[in-house]
Amino acid sequence: YRSDSLEPLSVVSNRYKVVQPKDVLHFYKDLVSAGGFELETAGVLKGGRKLWALAKTGQEARIKGNDRIKAYLLLATSCDGTLCTTAQFTSVRVVCNNTLQLATRDSNGAVKVPHSTQFDPRQVKEALGIGFASWESFMTNLKQLSQRTVSPQEADSFIRTVLNEPELTEDNVQGSKMFQTVNSLYQGKGMGSELSSASGTAWGLVNAMTEYVDHHRRARNQDNRLDSAWFGQGALLKQKAFNQALTLLH
């Protein structure tokens, strides 16, 4: 329960290892200090059930000159068992604030500790050191995606595959509203879609999908949208888009 309002947050089993917010914040500060990071912002979701923080890593790269990508460390835990204590590297595209988990074929850039396991900050730090080593590989992938031009047919197929959208028929000549939104973001309505790195490229397709999830996908409120984009179905959809885009490189 919350100590300020005494509002119950959840009913958990006796195997559940409680991680107090103050302990997590101390760990966050210790971790960002050890890594030379800078804690930028923190907040809660779901009425205090989830606690999160973003730390700047200081890593930044540019794609085709003016498309800036920054690396952040996203730290989160829950008080109701719905989320493992998690530390994951996340990229932020400066022009639009789209977020994408820093992942490669060999690493997902995340460390997760179930609440049934004793929280060991040292173990998390060591694992994160391995995850952060994938930054260069991740940026190499992004640059390759920005150089991969796609045809209108490939773009159409990509969006349909990621959204599980059926092919157009006589009865369905436009596609779903979701398909139309993502397609319009790719075609020029998306933030930064006019940049040479994104216009008509596989990187542009990825950003159309991440912008849709982060800023346009239907949600009851911004709290729910952010929760989904970072930890739920939205995060899975963005990762699916990224993985699908990588197949265009071969």
PLM feature spans:
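Intrinsically disordered, low-complexity regions enriched in serine/threonine
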Residues: 59-250
